[in-house]
């Protein structure tokens, strides 16, 4: 109970204390919602920026002044002081004309280096300092002239570049290509032992990821050391790479970086397939040849029965002559109907105007209705 009473007493004492009022600090300046300049107090002097032309730079010393300044320093060691004294003695013994030349050279260096040592003050009156010169940008204005706005567009330059490329290849075709004739070799057809036909893809003048691809084709029947059973097994091992319509196995490889590697891989793969086809353990005779991967295209040819023979040509010519003779007889008898004359006579007789549609006034109020009950277009003869 004692602890509870003490806690209650402390709580009542805290609540009975008067509330302290906090002294808020009033800002001396009025705050602005948006400002682009720093806040300044009235009466405080603003430091003025010195003009660039009034800035003074330290003039470089000549050797005599530099050595005398060094000798007046107390921080030199004995061996350093001896070295500076010898150098100062040597400078005093130098002829006056050399000293004047040295002074002239120092003056020229000072005048040339003065703009480089001048402090570049930013122009705060411009937006983003866009009028300032970029000191890091080095340009060579020798030989440059003003742009007269008379140049062609980039599309025209591209067309000219394309024309130059065509002319370059034309010069190569005229002057360099004929020189390759001395490297020409006569064509020698492949022998019966060369059954593999390799095909390569080359992009002249550029590197292309597809130029590594190598394609090989061969006919199983060209492998004379395989029997018919082994040849059929080789076709079944090739799977969808076998074309039953052309009787050719076609394979390709582009997994390696160079063409020689892909060609070597295809050669090793064909050797493994031939070795598997020669394996007498399983000849695959109980497995039919699957050709579902190939779509057979039926080539429709013109029937030989429909070809015109010499006898048929004579029969058609005789039938045409008979038809012409019959037409000539009808013309003489006046029984041949000429379609152009019939149409002309019909138009001249005026019978066509008699069949024109004439609107008949029908309906209520004496109005002609375009359609519906009582408003149909009727035909009548005049």
Curated annotation (Swiss-Prot):
GO terms for biological process: mitochondrial translation. It comes from the Eukaryota. Its main location: mitochondrion. GO terms for cellular component: mitochondrial small ribosomal subunit. The keyword Ribonucleoprotein applies. PANTHER family: MITOCHONDRIAL 28S RIBOSOMAL PROTEIN S28, SMALL RIBOSOMAL SUBUNIT PROTEIN MS35. Component of the mitochondrial ribosome (mitoribosome), a dedicated translation machinery responsible for the synthesis of mitochondrial genome-encoded proteins, including at least some of the essential transmembrane subunits of the mitochondrial respiratory chain. The mitoribosomes are attached to the mitochondrial inner membrane and translation products are cotranslationally integrated into the membrane. Belongs to the mitochondrion-specific ribosomal protein mS35 family. This is Small ribosomal subunit protein mS35. The gene is rsm24.
């Amino acid at each position: 109970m004692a602890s509870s009473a003490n806690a209650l007493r402390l709580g009542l004492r805290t609540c009975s204390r008067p509330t302290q009022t906090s002294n808020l600090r009033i800002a001396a300046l009025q705050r602005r919602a948006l400002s682009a300049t720093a806040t300044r107090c009235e009466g405080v002097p603003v430091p003025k920026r010195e003009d660039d032309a009034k800035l003074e730079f330290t003039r470089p010393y000549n050797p005599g002044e530099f050595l005398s300044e060094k000798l007046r320093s107390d921080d030199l060691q004995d061996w350093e002081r001896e070295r500076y004294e010898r150098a100062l003695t040597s400078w005093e013994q130098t002829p006056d004309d050399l000293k004047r030349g040295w002074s002239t050279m120092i003056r020229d260096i000072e005048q040339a280096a003065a703009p480089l040592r001048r402090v570049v003050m930013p122009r705060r009156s411009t937006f983003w300092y866009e009028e300032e010169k970029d000191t890091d940008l080095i340009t060579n204005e020798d030989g440059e002239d003003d742009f007269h706005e008379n140049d062609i567009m980039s599309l025209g330059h591209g067309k000219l570049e394309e024309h130059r490329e065509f002319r370059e290849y034309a010069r190569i075709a005229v002057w360099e290509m004929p020189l390759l004739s001395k490297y020409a070799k006569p064509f020698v057809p492949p022998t019966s032992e060369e059954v593999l036909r390799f095909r390569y893809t080359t992009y002249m003048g550029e590197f292309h990821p597809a130029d590594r691809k190598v394609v090989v084709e061969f006919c199983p029947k060209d492998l004379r050391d395989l029997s018919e059973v082994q040849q059929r097994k080789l076709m079944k091992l090739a799977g969808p790479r076998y074309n039953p319509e052309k009787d050719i196995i076609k394979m390709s490889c582009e997994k390696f970086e160079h063409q020689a590697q892909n060609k070597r891989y295809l050669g090793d793969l064909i050797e493994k397939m031939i070795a598997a086809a020669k394996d007498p353990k399983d000849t695959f005779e109980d497995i039919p040849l699957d050709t579902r991967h190939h779509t057979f295209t039926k080539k429709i040819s013109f029937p030989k029965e429909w070809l015109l023979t010499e006898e048929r040509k004579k029969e058609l010519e005789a039938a045409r002559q008979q038809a012409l003779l019959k037409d000539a007889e009808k013309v003489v008898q006046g029984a041949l109907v000429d379609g152009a004359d019939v149409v002309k006579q019909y138009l001249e007789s005026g019978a066509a105007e008699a069949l024109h549609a004439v609107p008949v006034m029908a309906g209520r109020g004496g109005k002609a209705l375009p359609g519906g009950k009582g408003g149909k277009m009727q035909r009548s003869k005049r």
